[in-house]
Structures are given as structure tokens and as C-alpha cells.
């Protein structure tokens, strides 16, 4: 079964994220559990936690259908010790918030070397950061998102994701989220079913589908291999509809949150309905 949704706003209270997801007929959703552009956040209150859990129960969202995202400020591969420590503390807080909310996944951008250390050293720092966070939390899986490779951001090669996973001690609590726009911008072609087969065969060989814990379904304004991260609505960008139809008809993508981060929230309900219809097409065929 496919879990299909979008990254919805939690403005006005975390429970509102579940309500907004239900309003667009989503069977999955993503959210920030705190302001993503600030380091600090007030601790979660018992009331906030209870309201969120009640809303998820009311609208039938389990933790397997929810993919929280951490703060954009966090860099788990930071080359400067003091800044790395700050990022690690913030990441642990994000993991603990998920734990309190009964959420089992936390999606994050791996990190950037800022042209100050090697890729290898940065990847090792990211893995070490994950190990520290896993040691201080329970029940939450660290879900590494592939990047488009802008600037000095790592994670744009499947080999980067594999190297991080290799350095994580508890393999049962690490996974990956593949963003289609990021993959395309990083040089993994998705424009035809044949290219999708090739790209995900590479993914299976280098990383492994057992680590796939979520996806971001985004078309791309950016061009193929450009290393530029610019999302677009499904079918309106340089990837096109075929990739998303292909994903919907492949059962390797079942049972994980498939999250839209496309640029027009006004048509998320339409995009979700279209994705669901592609899945139905296969059942009818």
C-alpha cells in the first residue's frame, strides 16, 4: 500500500498538521516539529503531545505514515568543532521531540563540508553524529535525505549515503529518503521508465531498498545534472509524469511516506489524487 501526502504546515499547533493532511485526502504527511529556521524551541507540552496523538488517531495516521523533517540549520558534518556540537545537540533535541510525539522517523539533510574538510572526513562526522543521537534516543530512525549537491552539500551520490550508513553502528535505526528532484539534479535520470529502472537498480546495488524509509516526490525546475535544487509541480518540470507513474506502480515503494514538496500547495489534493489513480491503473491493467 502506498502512503501518499505532502509536507504540511503545523502553524497553530502540531495537531493541525494531521488535520491539514486529512483535508487534502493524504495518507501520509511530513511536518516540522519546531520552527525549522531557529535553533531553539520551547519544550513540547503534555497538551501539545496529547493533541497531536489524538489528531493522528482521529485521521488514522500511524508513525509509519509520518515523515518529520529537522531544522535546515543543522549540519551534522560541520568542519568546526563548536558548530558541529551545536548541530549535534539540536539534532538530538529533534530526535527526542519525535520520540515524545510517538514518531518513528526523522528526515534530515546529511551535511556540508564547507570546503574546509574532505568529503570522506565530512561523511565520517555525519555517521558519528548519527551514532551519538541514536545512543541518546530510542525508537526513532535517522532518515538521510539525498541532496542535489548544491555548494558543498554531501549526499548527492548514492555512495555518500552508503558510506554514512556503513559508519552507523545500529543499522536498524538508519535509513534514507530519496528526493526525486535532488536525484535528477545530481545526475540520476528519471525521465523514462527505463531510466527509472537503471537509477533504482543503482540504488539497490549501492544502498539497498531495505534502507528506503521515505521519498520526496518532486518534479524539477532545475536541469538534469545541474546540481541545483529547484522543485516543480508534478509533470510540469524537467522530470515529467512518467517517473511518478512508475513509482506508483512499483511495490518496492509501498509502506513508506511518499511526500510532495511541490511548489503549489493549492494543487496538492489534485496531485495526491493523480498519484493514487496511477496506482489504481496498475490494479486494473
Curated annotation (Swiss-Prot):
GO MF: deoxyribonuclease IV (phage-T4-induced) activity; DNA binding; DNA-(apurinic or apyrimidinic site) endonuclease activity; phosphoric diester hydrolase activity; zinc ion binding
Pfam family, one: AP_endonuc_2
HAMAP family in the cross-refs: Nfo
Protein's gene: nfo
Residues engaged in binding Zn(2+) 2: 145, 179, 216, 261
Cofactor: Zn(2+)
PANTHER family for this protein: APURINIC-APYRIMIDINIC ENDONUCLEASE (PTHR21445:SF0), ENDONUCLEASE IV ENDODEOXYRIBONUCLEASE IV (PTHR21445)
Protein name from the UniProt record: Probable endonuclease 4
Top-level taxon in the UniProt lineage: Bacteria
EC number: 3.1.21.2
Catalytic activity: Endonucleolytic cleavage to 5'-phosphooligonucleotide end-products
Recorded family membership: Belongs to the AP endonuclease 2 family.
Cofactor binding note from Swiss-Prot or TrEMBL: Binds 3 Zn(2+) ions.
Binding site for Zn(2+) 1: 69, 109, 145
Amino acid at each position: 500500500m502506498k502512503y501518499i501526502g505532502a509536507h504540511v504546515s503545523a502553524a497553530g499547533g502540531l495537531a493541525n498538521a494531521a488535520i491539514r493532511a486529512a483535508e487534502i485526502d493524504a495518507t501520509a504527511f511530513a511536518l516540522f516539529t519546531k520552527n525549522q529556521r531557529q535553533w531553539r524551541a520551547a519544550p513540547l507540552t503534555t497538551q501539545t503531545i496529547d493533541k497531536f496523538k489524538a489528531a493522528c488517531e482521529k485521521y488514522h495516521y500511524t508513525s509509519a505514515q509520518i515523515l518529520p523533517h529537522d531544522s535546515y540549520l543543522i549540519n551534522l558534518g560541520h568542519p568546526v568543532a563548536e558548530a558541529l556540537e551545536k548541530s549535534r545537540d539540536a539534532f538530538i533535541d529533534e530526535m527526542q521531540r519525535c520520540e515524545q510525539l510517538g514518531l518513528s522517523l526523522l528526515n534530515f539533510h546529511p551535511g556540508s563540508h564547507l570546503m574546509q574538510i574532505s568529503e570522506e572526513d565530512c561523511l565520517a562526522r555525519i555517521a558519528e553524529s548519527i551514532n551519538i543521537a541514536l545512543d541518546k534516543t530510542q525508537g526513532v530512525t535517522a532518515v538521510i535525505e539525498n541532496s542535489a549537491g548544491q555548494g558543498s552539500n554531501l549526499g548527492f551520490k548514492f555512495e555518500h549515503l552508503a558510506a554514512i550508513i556503513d559508519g552507523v553502528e545500529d543499522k536498524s535505526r538508519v535509513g534514507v529518503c530519496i528526493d526525486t528532484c535532488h536525484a535528477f539534479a545530481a545526475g540520476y535520470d528519471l525521465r523514462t521508465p527505463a531510466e527509472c529502472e537503471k537509477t533504482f537498480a543503482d540504488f539497490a546495488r549501492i544502498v539497498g531498498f531495505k534502507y528506503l524509509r521515505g521519498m520526496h516526490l518532486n518534479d524539477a525546475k532545475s536541469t538534469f545534472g545541474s546540481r541545483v535544487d529547484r522543485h516543480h509541480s508534478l509533470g510540469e518540470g524537467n522530470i515529467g509524469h512518467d517517473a511518478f507513474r512508475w513509482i506508483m506502480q512499483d511495490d518496492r515503494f509501498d509502506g513508506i511516506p511518499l511526500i510532495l514538496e511541490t511548489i503549489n500547495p493549492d494543487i496538492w489534493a489534485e496531485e495526491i489524487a493523480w498519484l493514487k489513480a496511477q496506482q489504481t491503473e496498475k490494479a486494473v491493467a
